[in-house]
Amino acid sequence: MNKSGIQRFTGLWAGLMLSLLAAAPAFALDTVEPGSLTIAFSGDMPGTGYQDSKMVGYDGEILQQISGKLGLKVKPALMEWSGTIASVQARRVDVMAGTMGWTEQRSKIMALSDPIHYFKNGITQTDKTDWKTLKDLQGKKVGTITGFSFIPEMRKIPGLQVTLYDTSDAAVRDLLAGRIDAVIGDPPVMQYAISRNAQWHLHFNAFTDNDPDFPLLTGLGQVVFGFNKDNPQLLAAVNEQIQVLWKTCEMRKIGARYGLTQDVWFMPQGTDLRLSVDRPADWKLPGCQ
């Protein structure tokens, strides 16, 4: 073989090796369908949706980006929220997403990712008020959604009257009509709705309290993805990409598209309940200013 032939062969071989290395993550990772990341989601915005063959929503965009970095194709699996966790446990899907908050109980049945954003519960109210504390709600009529875990804590606030609703829409309608004074709902959902309906003249304030007697209302929440416990390699690969998105502040850019602009979503303030549970005691929460 002459010199030019050797050079061409060497170039082709180098190109082939680069292609194989670029594709390596997809083949190295154990997924339900080889080469794909199967995602269980409910389609509730601003967390997840599927449009134009791509995941959308805050959680959805993050997984879409991470899938690309890992060399995996996204395979959507739309289902009711109640079925997402069970699908992960049964390994019918690789991951579930949809503004799921970390809890110790969930950490026992799934492997939970590093946080993709934070949240604190708070008060949705009209522009006539600027309430930020539990004390501000004393003696007020406040709506929330049936089944929320913090309802018993709401009932402990002196003089507060709890009004239960089946949906966030119903609660907001009564707030706009003046039948209740405020709403304590799902923070990302409320913020997203407010950002898309300026004519409501509503705003959301996260609780500034950090009261150990009201941990669910005032504590630090972490939104995470859920994985099967028998697939630590996939979890580690996704966590590595989550950390990159934090370091580049891409999290804030994605959040801005869905109304999540306040520091509370991206700067952890409060006790990290994961320490010594599913994270080492010296683990540090990521953030972006």
Model-flagged regions — what are they?
Residues 75-86, 129, 163-179:
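Short helix-initiation/N-cap motifs at beta->coil->alpha
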Residues 60-69, 128, 135-136, 140-141, ...:
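Extended ligand-binding regions for polar small-molecule ligands
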Residues 42-44, 117-125, 198-239, 264-283:
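Periplasmic-binding protein-like
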Residues 27-52, 130, 135-141, 278-289:
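Immediate post-signal peptide segment of exported/extracytoplasmic ligand-binding proteins
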Residues 72, 101, 114-159:
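A conserved helix-loop-strand patch within extracytoplasmic ligand-binding domains
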Residues 83-86, 98-108, 153-156, 181-219:
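A ligand-binding cleft/hinge motif common to bilobed small-molecule-binding domains
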Residues 73, 152-165, 202-206, 236-284:
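Ligand-binding clefts/hinges and TM-proximal coupling segments of bilobed small-molecule sensing domains
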Residues 29-100, 108, 257, 261:
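Extracytoplasmic small-molecule ligand-binding "clamshell" domains
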